[in-house]
Amino acid sequence: MFQLTRRSTIPKMRKWTALLGLLLLVQPLFAQKDKREPLTEPEIEQIREAGIVPSQRIDLYTKFLNEHADTIKSLTARKKTDARAQHLDNELQDFTALMDELGSNLDTYSDRHADIRKALKPLSESTDRWLSILRALIGEPSFDLARKEAIESGEDLADQAKRLLTEQTEYFILHKDEAYQERAEPKSKPDDK
């Protein structure tokens, strides 16, 4: 009788082990699916193509952020539903991720002394518009955290853009020979002979 029970238990354990193994293999696929990408593939390709031209890259990020801001604004006028709240939460998270990514790019371009003044002016104007849209959005429990993070990120980006515009204006007054360059080129030193 012991063997009969043991024989019937082993196949059941194998089935459970196989099921558990399958679940462990499938779980990472669901985790990857949940990771949101704030840009579409064509937008990512445009960013890549503009990769070596800082002002174009900033202009593209500004354009894509304007599109997200318009989407957020259009969602605020819709009837309050769970689907709307989820869509707003996703858009706000994407918006924040893009602003943070743009901020990182600005840091890099600033360190290189790339002349990005032309792109900073429209960015600075846009950040004011984005913040007014975000502040006008009445928070709901399902997306209030994302809204607050977007406002904080927007304020940081607005401050950064204005500060960089001032710094760059002052820098290029002193370094006129470097103005309008995508990155500061090292100056050649005369050979000491």
Labelled PLM ranges:
Residues 10-11, 18-19, 151:
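General helical structural elements
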Residues 1-13:
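N-terminal secretory signal peptides that target proteins for export/translocation
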Residues 8-9, 16-17, 185:
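Small/flexible residues
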Residues 17-28:
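Bacterial N-terminal signal peptides
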Residues 14-18, 120-121:
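Short, surface-exposed loop and linker segments with low hydrophobicity and enrichment for Pro/Ser/Thr
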